[in-house]
From Swiss-Prot:
Organism: Homo sapiens (Human)
Extra facts: Binds to and activates LILRB4 on acute myeloid leukemia (AML) cells which leads to suppression of T cell proliferation and promotion of AML cell migration and infiltration.
rRNA processing listed as a keyword: no
Organs and tissues of expression: Produced by several tissues and cell types and mainly found associated with lipid particles in the plasma, the interstitial fluid and lymph. Mainly synthesized by liver hepatocytes. Significant quantities are also produced in brain, mainly by astrocytes and glial cells in the cerebral cortex, but also by neurons in frontal cortex and hippocampus. It is also expressed by cells of the peripheral nervous system. Also expressed by adrenal gland, testis, ovary, skin, kidney, spleen and adipose tissue and macrophages in various tissues.
Protein name (Swiss-Prot/TrEMBL): Apolipoprotein E
GO MF: amyloid-beta binding; antioxidant activity; cholesterol transfer activity; enzyme binding; heparan sulfate proteoglycan binding; heparin binding; identical protein binding; lipid binding
Region (Specificity for association with VLDL): 278-290
Amino acid sequence: MKVLWAALLVTFLAGCQAKVEQAVETEPEPELRQQTEWQSGQRWELALGRFWDYLRWVQTLSEQVQEELLSSQVTQELRALMDETMKELKAYKSELEEQLTPVAEETRARLSKELQAAQARLGADMEDVCGRLVQYRGEVQAMLGQSTEELRVRLASHLRKLRKRLLRDADDLQKRLAVYQAGAREGAERGLSAIRERLGPLVEQGRVRAATVGSLAGQPLQERAQAWGERLRARMEEMGSRTRDRLDEVKEQVAEVRAKLEEQAQQIRLQAEAFQARLKSWFEPLVEDMQRQWAGLVEKVQAAVGTSAAPVPSDNH
């Protein structure tokens, strides 16, 4: 009987899980059309689009997503995309502020304040997404070994609400940036040639940055990892080349020291030979003189011996 109840319970849970996954996967997204409408190709919008696509993948709550949610990989990726979005948004806002110089100070301050508020709301919503995923990871870890179906359903609902808030705040931010840009255009149309001259390089720089960011957006994570690997490999090869060059320098220094030592040894040998020659020149005359004196002494002794040995003549005849 217990086995039968267990089988029924497993079948019921599996059916619930299949229904939840089907509901998540087949959920209509009417906001996609609106998303494509406000995306005009600005750098911050491209970065936000990458954040949006990654969040959509997380919202599927597939097995891979659930596995990675138990680690900090998903939140790290989302935070990196969030930082990139805010960085690009700040850069775009700075460019527009440079173009708003001819506008009245009061108008510029009001526009800047409204834009900062919209930017803060967008950042807070993106931070809420990361915080909700961290909370979900903690709850799942606390319920280890138990059913987490209710947590998944609740997380899916929160993510849907957060995505709608993100879309609304992004749309509001885009409209305020359009007002900002219109103010810059109005200032340029007042005949300030200096502003016109500055707008040309800024627009070209924006196109270059948008093209660069757009190309990076199309690269999958694997290609980026390969690019990082290539840069790391090039760095290692550079370090190896420097090490080999350093070893060659050490070898050259050792060879130079060896040559100097051999040269010094040769000089010492030459000095010893010269000193030996000087000693020989000092003592050789003395030896020759002693040899001559000895030879003379020998001759004298021989002469004396010969004289004493001669016969004495006799007087008897």
